Amino acid sequence: LSNSWYIPSFFCGVGGTMFGPDGTDGSVPCDFDDEKGLAVTNYLIDLAANPKFTNQANEEAGKAINLFTEGKLGAFFSGSWDREAIETALGDNFACAQLPSFKAGDYEGTMKSYAGSKAIGVNPTCENMDVAVALAVYLGNADCQKIRYEVRGVVPLDSTGIDDVMLNAITDTVNNTSVAQPLVSEMNGWWSNAEAFGKAIVAGEVNHDNAQDKLTNFIANVNAGGSL
C-alpha cells in the first residue's frame, strides 16, 4: 500500500480515473476522492489492519518472499524481477495469475495495475544513422525479445513461441486487469503523495473517522502537484 505504483489499482478497480478516462488529459483532475474512492479507502484501512496482510515496499520484498518458505504467505504482488526468488521459495507450487477482484463497501471491481512499455530509440543526430537503425531493429526483433525475457525477465511485446506461466499471467493482466499509466506532466503530483497516503494508512493515521478528510486532502494535493 505504501508503493505509489500499486495503490491506484484499488481506486481504478472501482472505476476511478486519473486525468481523463484514458489518462491523457491533464486538465481533468484525478477523481479518487469521490464516494467510490472513500469506499476504497475504508477497504484499505481494514486491509492494512488484517493480520493476514503484510505490507512490504520493494526494498523489503525479500522479507515477504521469505514467508513463502515458512508457509506463512499465500500470495504476493510483484513483477517478473522477483520470479527467481519466489519460484525458489515455492518450488513446484509456483504459479501466477492476473489481479483479483475485490469488494469495497457497495462497490465491486477488479484491481487494475498500471500498464506501460519501453521502446528502443535512435538518436536522430547520430553520425551512423543506418547502423544505429539496424541495431535498434535487431534489438527489437522477436528473437532478442525472447532472449531478454529468458535472461532478464523483461516482458516481450511479441511472445510468439513462448509458453510460460508467468508470461501468460502478465499477458492476462495487461489485457484484463490494467489501465495505461498516465504520462501527462500532472502525474508529477501523484507519486510522493500516493506513497505518503499509503504509508499513513499502514501506520493507522488514516482511519474510518477521518478517511474522507484525509482522502480529500490527498487528492487535492495530487491535482495541485503539491505534497502532504
Predicted regions and their residues:
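Extracytoplasmic/periplasmic solute-binding protein
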Residues: 1-29, 73
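Pocket-flanking alpha-helical
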Residues: 6, 65-66, 82-89, 220-223
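Glycine-centered hinge/linker elements that transmit conformational signals in sensory
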Residues: 25-57
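Extracytoplasmic/periplasmic substrate-recognition and gating elements
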Residues: 49, 88-151
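Short helix-initiation/N-cap motifs at beta->coil->alpha
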Residues: 55-69
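Beta->alpha turn/N-cap motifs
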Residues: 61, 77-83, 99-100, 116-118
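Alpha-to-beta junction loops
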Residues: 70-78, 92
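Conserved C-terminal helix/tail region of periplasmic/extracytoplasmic solute-binding proteins
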Residues: 175-228
